[in-house]
Amino acid sequence: MARWSVWRSPVMLPRSWIEELTASGMRCSSSMPVIRQAYSESSSIVRPFSEIPGLWKNGLANLYNFWKLDGFRNLHRIMLQNFNTFGPIYREKIGYYESVNIINPEDAAILFKAEGHYPKRLKVEAWTSYRDYRNRKYGVLLKNGEEWRSNRVILNKEVISLKMLENFVPLLDDVGQDFVARVHKKIQRSVYSTHCAGSAPFLCLSFTLSFAAVSSVLYGERLGLMLDYIDPEAQHFIDCITLMFKTTSPMLYIPPSLLRQIGAKVWRDHVEAWDGIFNQADRCIQNIYRQLRQETGSPKRYPGILASLLMLDKLSIEDIKASVTELMAGGVDTTSITLLWTLYELARHPTLQEELRAEVVAARAESQGDMQEMLKRIPLVKGALKETLRLHPVAVSLQRYIAEDIIIQNYHIPAGTLVQLGLHAMGRDPKVFFRPEQYQPSRWLRTETHYFRSLGFGFGPRQCLGRRIAETEMQIFLIHMLENFRVEKQRHVEVQSTFELILLPDKPIILTLKPIQASR
C-alpha cells in the first residue's frame, strides 16, 4: 500500500502559531495529531465568525512563518495539516490574503449555493496587475459581474457545450495519433526497444502534445507538434507558461504593486512570461483573422473556436483575444501534468493498466474505430482520470466570495468572505473517500453518491471553461497510449507534489514505454 509523505513527515508549525492556538483554547502537540474537530458536533448554537478556529490574528507574522515553512512550495501540505489540526473549517490570514477554508463535500454544496448570480473567485493579483501594467483586456477568467456573465454565456456555446465535442474529437484524435507515432519513431531510432519517459525530452513532448491539442481546437490548425523536432516558438510558449505559474505563487501573499515598485526579479520574470504568452497568442490570432478575411463563403471544415467566435461577431476582437489567450495559457501545463500523473499511477498498478487496456481494445472493436463512439465505451479510463484528479489535483483549492451570509459547521460566515474548498485535502480525507491513499478508478463506477466529490474542473457557471477540451484530449491520449505502449516505472521511486500555483511533481517522473508488439 502506498504511503504519502504528508503523513510520514507532517509540517511542523512554528512556536508562535502554537502559542496562538493555545491562547484560543486548542490543544496542539508537537506530533500534530489528527483532531478533526474543534467544535461540538451536537451543538446547534450558531457561533460568530470571530470564533472560527485558525491563524488569522496576525497576517504579517503568519506570512513570515509561512515563508519559514517554505509555504510557497508546500501550501497543499500546510492546508492538509491545518485541517488535521483545526477540523473541517478554519480561518487564516497570510499577509494580506484572508480566507475561510472547508473540506467536507456537504459544506461545498452550501458554499456553491451561496455563490450568487455572478460567482466570484479569488482574484489573482499578479495576473490582473500584468494586464493593467500592459494595458491589456481581461478575459473571462479574470472578469466579474455582468460583463463576465454576458461573455461567459457566449463562450459556453462555442467552448464547453456538449454539442461541440463532435468538432473537437477529430482534431484531438489526429494529434493523439501523431504523438504516439513520434514516440514510436524515437524508440526505433534508439538502441533499445523502450523509451525513457520522464527525461526532459519526453516532458517537452507531453507539453507539446497539449499545446498542439489546444491550438488545434482554438485555431483549427496544429501548432508545434512536428515528427522530427519541436517548433522553437512552441517551446518558448511552453517555457513562458511554466515561468508564469512559478512566479505567480509568491505574489499570492505579497502585493504585486509593491514588488513592481522595488523592481523585484519575480515581478520582472512574471512580466517577461506573460509578454511571451501574449506575443505568441497575438501571432496566432492575427494569422487566423487574416485568413478569414481572405476566404469567401462558409468554411468546409470546422475552423476552430477563434474563427467561430469571430464569425459569430457577438464579442469584440479584444475580448475574444483576451479569452482565447487565457485558454491557450491554461491548456498546456494543466493537462500534460494530469496525463503524466495518470501514466505514473498506471505504471505503479500494472494489473489495473491491463484492465484499462482491455477496455480500450473492446471499445475499439465495438465502435469499429469511431473515436466518438469509443469515448462512450471507456468508463474505467474516465474513472482513472477522475482518480488522478482526486489524488493529484491541478488546483489546491476552489474559491468563492460568497454573495450571502451562510452557516457552515455551525459558524456564521458573512457575505463577501473568501471561502476555499481544499481539493487536495478532501481527496485524502478518509471521512470522504474509503482508503484514500489507494488509486482506485473503480470507485467512480459504483452506485454510491459522488456528491460534490469530483470537482477537479470546478463547479457551476464558473467551472473551467476548457473542461470539455481537456477531458476529451486526455481520454483520447490515454486510448492511444494504452493501445500502443505498456508503461513501467523505476522501482522504489515515490513522487510527491510541489506547489507552483498549480501542483506539479516534485521530481521527474521516470517511466519506460514498451511498444505492445515488442513486449509480447
Give the label of every model feature segment.
Residues 81, 486, 502-520:
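C-terminal helix/juxtamembrane-tail motif
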Residues 65-87, 279, 283, 370-409, ...:
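Conserved cytochrome P450 K-helix E-x-x-R motif and the immediately C-terminal K′/meander segment
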Residues 421-447:
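Conserved cytochrome P450 K-helix/beta-meander segment immediately N-terminal to the heme-binding cysteine loop
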Residues 34-70, 74-171, 175, 202, ...:
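Cytochrome P450 substrate-recognition site 1
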Residues 1-49:
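N-terminal mitochondrial targeting presequence
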Residues 210, 214, 277-282, 307-361, ...:
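Central I-helix of cytochrome P450 enzymes
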Residues 350-352, 467-504, 508:
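Cytochrome P450 heme-binding "Cys pocket" and the immediately downstream C-terminal segment
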Residues 124-128, 166-339:
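Cytochrome P450 heme-thiolate monooxygenase catalytic core
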